[in-house]
């Protein structure tokens, strides 16, 4: 095998060796005999096919398998020589030389190893911070918003003009030119003005109408509207406003608190205000975490922790980022790059710094998460994808299959792990 290994640093190594002809022939013979036991060939009983016939028919594939096995043995020997466990191997080794000759195949391989990260006490990396306070004014404002949202609907005073926030009971019918279109008609439809639940311009043109009034309005369906027949079309809607309803004023009270907190046997206004205060405090904490502290924490970790990165992983990340950016380029830019390899290399190199940081953060998060006992379970991963797909109006099962088929689940899991870890560390800082 003539194995030679070189450890460049703690995360990178090379291995050189020869896949000797005798070893390759030995493996080819064994693979041929194994195949002869299982393959069915016309003119021979199963299990009785001569190895020579197998080699003649499947020689190229068997040779590839023999070389693959021999290469794996060389790699295993290289790891042992380097004092590394197979579990430390990161990514697929890159073959940089594969020279076939009469006596075998000369091979050189680049190897990436899991980096060695020395972690201090986790909270030493967390920036100092104070949680925002919650004022009485904020609590009262939220309380009044809640009271307004839960207020019952009541008929508006006679003669009131429709305005934003009001509820309009309408009959409507839509037309393309003189022809009514399917799905464009409803009676006694309750529409909150300003809810933006109808196509743009529809609700705005109802403002100022009074109960009993009729009006024709003109709107244009969005270009990306779900119905191809209606997408981008100008339409007329005939509207009849039958009734205006408004939210009846409701003063917060103990009784109101009981209706909002039915699960609390001792619910009262003070308890409701405490719950509101907790909710606002949580919202402010999440906003502070996401807008400022998580970024600072990651910056601290990247600056404080120095370790070698496997070059193969960094190069793969650069390739990934580079390919993703190509989709945003114009046809002219793509064509220019296609004819200029130096420009391609320069464009790719622009992403080295960000890709290197991304890889470093991934290894840090993985190491810290193991130290802190943080993990993302399969049910959490699936639940997140389901919620996101429903929020986008997509089929959750189809979205999950898309992520699986495009090997995107590991990236989603890592993003969730990073967020979960950073939140955990910041919460631990609060506890002291």
UniProtKB/Swiss-Prot annotation:
It comes from the Bacteria. Its EC number is 5.2.1.8. Disulfide bonds: none annotated. InterPro entries: PPIase_dom_sf, PPIase_FKBP_dom, Trig_fac, Trigger_fac_C, Trigger_fac_C_sf, Trigger_fac_ribosome-bd_bac, Trigger_fac_ribosome-bd_sf, Trigger_fact/SurA_dom_sf. It catalyses: [protein]-peptidylproline (omega=180) = [protein]-peptidylproline (omega=0). It is found in: Cytoplasm. One of its GO terms (cellular component) is cytoplasm. Residues 165-250 form the PPIase FKBP-type domain. GO terms for biological process: cell division; protein folding; protein transport. Coiled coil: none annotated. Keywords: Cell cycle, Cell division, Chaperone, Cytoplasm, Isomerase, Rotamase. GO terms for molecular function: peptidyl-prolyl cis-trans isomerase activity. Its main location: cytoplasm. Belongs to the FKBP-type PPIase family. Tig subfamily. Consists of 3 domains; the N-terminus binds the ribosome, the middle domain has PPIase activity, while the C-terminus has intrinsic chaperone activity on its own. Involved in protein export. Acts as a chaperone by maintaining the newly synthesized protein in an open conformation. Functions as a peptidyl-prolyl cis-trans isomerase. This is Trigger factor. It comes from Wolinella succinogenes (strain ATCC 29543 / DSM 1740 / CCUG 13145 / JCM 31913 / LMG 7466 / NCTC 11488 / FDC 602W). The lineage of its organism: Bacteria, Pseudomonadati, Campylobacterota, Epsilonproteobacteria, Campylobacterales.
